[in-house]
Amino acid sequence: MSTGYTGFEALWHDLFWEAEEAPSEVLLMDDFLQDKDGKSLYVGSGSGRLLGPLVEAEHELGGLEMSPEMVALSREKFPLAEVVEGAWQDHQGEDKYASIVIPAFTFQLFSDPQKQLQRLWEQTDHLYLTLFFPWAELSGDLPQNEWYFDRGIQLPTGESGELETRHKIKEQGGSLVRRHRYTMKDAAGAVVRAEETEQRLRFFTDVALKNLLKKTGWEIEKEIENLGDEDDLVYVATFYLRGC
Ligand SMILES: C[S@@+](CC[C@H](N)C(=O)[O-])C[C@H]1O[C@@H](n2cnc3c(N)ncnc32)[C@H](O)[C@@H]1O
C-alpha cells in the first residue's frame, strides 16, 4: 500500500479538491505573500494547483514536493513554476527564505512537528500554515474502523472515480490514520481498478498548538478561521507566523 500521492491519489488530486467545493486558499496565500520581498518556498506544492496561479501573479515562489508524480503534473501544467523534488526534512535552503508557505494540512503529515517548526524557524522569519481539525472523526459523525463513501468524481475519459475512507483516531495522542481507497469504474459501473493508500496525520488542540509555537519561537501575527467562511466550529485554521 502506498503512503503518499502516487497513482490515482496523485492523478485525481485536483479533481477531488474541486469536488469538495471548499474555498480556495490561493487568496489567503496571495495576501500573505504581498509584502514578502525575495524568494519564498512552498512546501508540499503538489500538482501546482495553488503554486501555478501564485507564480502567474508574479510572486517569487518556488515549490518543494516529495512525490515525483505530483512534481511531473506540476511541471506539465505550470512549466513556469519552479519545483524541486525532495522532502522538507532533507531540505536546506541556500539563504534564508523571505517566507515559507505550507497550506492544505501538509504540515500535519510531518511525524515530528516540533523539530520541523524549529527547522522552519532557521530557514525563514515568516511562515504561513494551514491546519485542519478532525471534528467529524472525533464526534463520531464519521464511523471509525469502517469504510465509508467520501467523494465521487467524473473523469474526463468517461469513467468515474470513487474515494472511500476508513480512519482510526487517537484523541489523546492527537493522531489520525486515514486509509483511502480509490476506485475507477467504467460507464456501466464495473470496477476497472482500485488502489489503497494510508496517511498518518497529527492534529493539535488550540492550547497544544499555541504551546508548540511558543516553544519553537513562533508568534501568531494573524489567524483566519475556515479560510474566511463563517462557522461555529473551526475546521480549518490558517496562521501567519513571525519568528521571534
Ligand atoms: C494535501 S497535499 C497538498 C498539495 C498542494 N499543497 C495543494 O494544496 O494542492 C500534500 C502534498 O505535500 C506533499 N508532501 C507531504 N509531505 C512532504 C514533505 N515532507 N516534503 C515535501 N512534500 C511533502 C505530498 O506529496 C502532497 O503532494
Where are each of the predicted segments found?
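Class I SAM-dependent methyltransferase SAM/SAH-binding core
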Residues: G48-D90
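Residues at the starts of beta-strands that form the adenosine-phosphate
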Residues: K39, E60, H126
